[in-house]
């Protein structure tokens, strides 16, 4: 399948967590003017769009994913005038704007929910209410953040559903009035020049209307990719996404390839593309996140093969290692010590060689690491604090849990962007809302830009190559060493061209046999000072990666 690509099919998107990007007021919290301040930096990197995580009015129970007003900007972040200026300034540099839409739930501070507390209000039907007794919820479904997924409301003597925090009440998508209001939100932002939407946990919007007990789990099988999810997204697409030319990416929690082939079908009847997270659970032994475990690289490669081959010519992938909910990838699958730079470059080269739209999370392009927090008071994340309390309650050792948090907490990616080696890494003149990484004096944007062999310039080149080489957009995917736990070697083919990507996933030198690599190759990318101009038998250095292209 080849045609002129949509902008996002050969583009790269940069994710900004505004709270931790740049503070311009001294409040200790980043803001929209801080994003404007660094647009030239993002333009230099070469990204096509920026996705901003929520900056709407919010009590900040879940860092803005508890929205109290979808069309008002939280004063902490600025004003609508600031936002309009951001759009204008970004577009003048060829950078599009993507906003985060949290449509599975609202904050319990939202006007709709406040109205819904009255049983007679039409807004009651905007949420999911069920009968029960004060100590007996309607079913045994669990919240993603721990505890029951139901919260009792004494005045109206019913429970409401919250798949996340109790302050995040799930919307009732069965109600057409809810869908109509959410379409208006999309229209509001499209009118202000927004080019795309990232839809938070959007495959959870349709619940099994029977709300059955889950005898084998936490309830997720009754609302994940639920009965009407495709129908609802088809309607949103028909009424808003397509008419307004919005690119859409759905965050898909615990989804399947088969569902994503429908959500992100190239026919474009639901969404443009999907995020799935299976590849970021290869260090969750038995599916358990709160453990210390090395990644299973054979499983990682198997998952990428499954999705690359399963989506090829059928649907569109989003490619990512990092976001605001995941630890830093170089700490997780690479190295924080002497091999940090080649490891960060290798991980970038492996991902950006694949089919799909790559996403870069702020700081990933300079190889930022986890911050190495040592005290529970360092953490801000509701999920981390809840899990620590719950597991301590179960008798688990505090030091063990702190080691797990230092490896797995969502706060690992939420520390301030490291701009310079100055005070607070150049992020704020005030007291930062969360502590800084302990290595910002060495790892920062200023240092990266001054060093032409830094991780930054590898990302810059990968972004440029995506526009230059159509094989990256359209080629197929073949894993050449699926069973190796230390080498990742894949080939992509398209219209008589071949791209070969090889990578050493380990700290040790690894021999690689080139096999039947005939013909004339061009060396395209490498992460050490020099590399073989042709694929041949070689010893790959720690975290070494090479791309060759045959035309």
From Swiss-Prot:
Would I find Hydrolase among this entry's keywords? yes
- Phosphoprotein among the record's keywords? no
Q: Which reaction does it catalyse?
A: alpha,alpha-trehalose 6-phosphate + H2O = D-glucose 6-phosphate + D-glucose
Site described as Transition state stabilizer, located at: 325
Gene Ontology cellular component? cytosol
> Where along the chain is the active site annotated?
200 (nucleophile), 251 (proton donor)
Q: Name one Pfam family in it.
A: Alpha-amylase
One GO term in the molecular function aspect is: alpha-amylase activity
GO terms in the biological process aspect are: DNA damage response; oligosaccharide catabolic process; trehalose catabolic process
> Which top-level enzyme class is recorded in the Swiss-Prot or TrEMBL entry?
hydrolase
Q: Which UniProt keywords apply?
A: Cytoplasm, Glycosidase, Hydrolase
* Database matches in SMART domains: Aamy
NCBIfam families given for it? PRK10933.1 (NF008183), trehalose_treC (TIGR02403)
Function in brief: Hydrolyzes trehalose-6-phosphate to glucose and glucose 6-phosphate. Can also very effectively hydrolyze p-nitrophenyl-alpha-D-glucopyranoside, but it does not recognize trehalose, sucrose, maltose, isomaltose, or maltodextrins.
Q: What is this protein called?
A: Trehalose-6-phosphate hydrolase
Species this protein is from: Escherichia coli (strain K12)
| Gene that encodes the chain | treC
